[in-house]
Amino acid sequence: MAPGLLENNTLSGTAAPRTEFKAIVNDLRELQAHVQRVQSAIEAPEVQSWLNEQLHHPDQLPDKELEQLALDLVDSMDKLQLQLVPSVSLLTDGFFGYLNSKTLWTVVEAQVADRLAENGPQPVSTLGLRCGIQPERLAQLLDTLVSNGIFAYNPADDTYSNNRASLLLCHDHWTQWHLWADLYPNEFFDVSRAMPQAVRLGESRTAAQIAYGTDLDLFEYLAKEQKLAKFQKTLGAGAVAQARGLTVDYPWEEIGSEPILDIGGGSGAFLASLLRAHPHLRGSLMDIQSVIELITPEFREPHGRFSDIGSRVQQLVVGDFTKQIPPSAVYTMKWCLHDWVDDDVLTILKNVRRSIVPSSVSRFLVVESIKSPGRSGRLPRYGDLIMMITCNGKERSLEDWKRLGELAGWKLYQVHRVRRAWPCIIDFRPM
């Protein structure tokens, strides 16, 4: 007779006390009952309203303590479910995960969220006609997305509606997340097809170069094919959506009147957001010549996007941060270092260390994602693979940043978690 649930049996072949099995099973049953009670309480309308206000409001930063509690809890539950989910089920997410991305893009392209926002809850018979999708197929698409927490379904009247996640996909939503549902499940999906070739021993080309059949880097290729605007628009929208947390979740008042030099500042949106949020700050921006030529009118012309803070932008500097960096006491660098391998990052960190002006506020603030285990760390892990296939770059762990910083003469003073943003602010101080 096969051993039952509480018989002496383990996968390792080592016998365990029957009472230990009982204790584990009882713990799981108690946990299940407790989770059901909490779930029932959370689903109460007044609790939902409170959570949406404190944790999920699209236009306000979440409560710090509540958000951290939620993240820690999600990570704990994720770690537990990995121990309980059948092995083949773990593999199936890898087999079929691409379908989530393609399903999301299909409904975004058809503007399903927009039609629901305009007309309220609808059955698929009506919604499908408004979106140009076969109603039966739309039901299949939405069934998957509802199970993923995107859109809501009411079985009482067989209607679908927007929820807090799907509302972010509306084309007129200020965050413009719908752009990400296009670029990554399409262009970046195509690039990922070449991942197996790109990681082989002796291969120096990126997956993007292999997929597109070019020796140009990704940015040069996109510019040549007149596709760079879509890429820049998508990443720019993401930067806007995440900007507020970056301006408030670091003690920028510590810098006082010391000017900031934003290295590799790109469009200038990050520097502009800091100056708008903190009237006492002044700054300059450094980037390559083509970028500086592009953004100069935005700061210097009367109708430029950043003309309102243009007088507090002291210089727009042409330069190459892999070679030389102008002196400053305070530097910032956002989403640049993940484009580079460790040796290049070390060179850049050393360049900044050599140039920094000693003062009581001297620091180098690196805005990058930090890899970590658990469900809450999945975005940096996605980013790590994106960097790998597009530019041979990588995201890094906290230990990676400590090690590289110390090799370049920096002490990792503190890491500031940023609400509603994927990167952290890594505060390096000169050693």
Swiss-Prot record:
Family: Belongs to the class I-like SAM-binding methyltransferase superfamily. Cation-independent O-methyltransferase family. COMT subfamily.
SUPFAM superfamilies linked to this entry: S-adenosyl-L-methionine-dependent methyltransferases, Winged helix' DNA-binding domain
Positions of S-adenosyl-L-methionine binding: 287, 319-321
Hydrolase recorded as keyword: no
Gene induction: Expression is positively regulated by the brlA and abaA transcription factors.
UniProt keyword terms in alphabetical order: Coiled coil, Methyltransferase, S-adenosyl-L-methionine, Transferase, Virulence
Descriptive protein name: O-methyltransferase gliM
InterPro entries: COMT-like, O_MeTrfase_dom, Plant_O-MeTrfase_dimerisation, SAM-dependent_MTases_sf, WH-like_DNA-bd_sf, WH_DNA-bd_sf
GO biological process, one term: gliotoxin biosynthetic process
UniProt-recorded Gene Ontology molecular function terms: O-methyltransferase activity; protein dimerization activity
Active site: 338 (proton acceptor)
Protein's gene: gliM
Pathway the protein takes part in: Mycotoxin biosynthesis
This enzyme's EC code(s): 2.1.1.-
Its job: O-methyltransferase; part of the gene cluster that mediates the biosynthesis of gliotoxin, a member of the epipolythiodioxopiperazine (ETP) class of toxins characterized by a disulfide bridged cyclic dipeptide. The first step in gliotoxin biosynthesis is the condensation of serine and phenylalanine to form the cyclo-L-phenylalanyl-L-serine diketopiperazine (DKP) by the NRPS gliP. GliP is also able to produce the DKP cyclo-L-tryptophanyl-L-serine, suggesting that the substrate specificity of the first adenylation (A) domain in gliP is sufficiently relaxed to accommodate both L-Phe and L-Trp.
Coiled-coil positions: 20-85
Top EC group: transferase
